[in-house]
A protein has these predicted regions:
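PAPS-dependent sulfotransferase catalytic core
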Residues: 1-88, 208-225
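PAPS-dependent sulfotransferase catalytic domain
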Residues: 95-206
């Protein structure tokens, strides 16, 4: 199984990552900033070169005519490129850990300011991994905005609120698929069963006692520092 812990910065998703890593059958690697975004952009650029660009800008010049700026784009095998990208990601990014069930922490898919791009990136992940488990995590915008990464950013409350609501709406609408979990930091940080029970239900052999210890550490990067 493949999974991703999808959230936004300073929601406690590193605690979820550590909780998952107490199990003996699931492993979660840390975030790789913008990797999924750039992989998606690569594939989307090839699709655009093959379809929308010729149709909108050069409708009268065939793609097998070298007067066309996207000459021979129609011969690009998109499915093969996707398969190569997927294989490279599995082997060289996820493959750094040895586990039958591997996932990653993802904080860089943002509905702010463009929800359509975020939805497309989620769809891209589901293209790579059709049965992927999305573990979604949210946190109260006011509390989240006090942490160091947010408090000096303009419009941080609006961005956090937007991203939080996008996750909730996506969970309800099904863009993350039927196989997803919605967690709320403001609940599970006070009651660890709100974190433990959904992970166990997903098949993770986690150590509940260790998770209690991890949560109680109060990681500094999600505090008010």
């Amino acid at each position: 199984m493949y999974f991703t812990v999808l959230s936004y910065p300073r929601t406690g998703s590193t605690v979820i990552q550590r909780a998952i890593n107490t199990s003996n059958n699931f492993k979660c690697i840390g975030e790789k900033p913008m990797v999924i975004n750039h992989m998606h952009a690569l594939i989307q650029s090839l699709i655009d070169a093959k379809t929308s660009i010729p149709e909108s800008l050069f409708p009268d010049i065939p793609m097998n005519d070298d007067r066309n700026p996207v000459f021979m784009a129609h011969e690009v095998d998109i499915d093969s490129v996707i398969n190569y990208v997927k294989a490279a990601y599995i082997r060289h990014v996820l493959g750094v850990v040895d586990s039958p069930n591997i996932g990653w922490k993802e904080n860089f898919i943002s509905s702010y300011p463009d929800e359509k791009v975020a939805n497309s990136e989620v769809a891209f992940i589901r293209t790579l991994f059709p049965d992927i488990l999305f573990i979604l995590n949210i946190r109260d915008p006011e509390e989240c905005s006090r942490s160091s990464i947010w408090k000096f950013r303009d419009d941080s409350i609006n961005e956090i609120t937007n991203r939080r609501q996008w996750i909730i709406n996506g969970f309800n609408s099904g863009i993350f698929g039927d196989n997803c979990i919605l967690l709320d930091y403001d609940e599970w940080s006070k009651d660890s069963s709100k974190l433990i029970n959904p992970l166990v239900a997903a098949g993770m052999n986690i150590n509940a006692q260790t998770i209690e210890s991890v949560i109680s550490e109060k990681l500094t990067h999600i505090s008010n520092i």
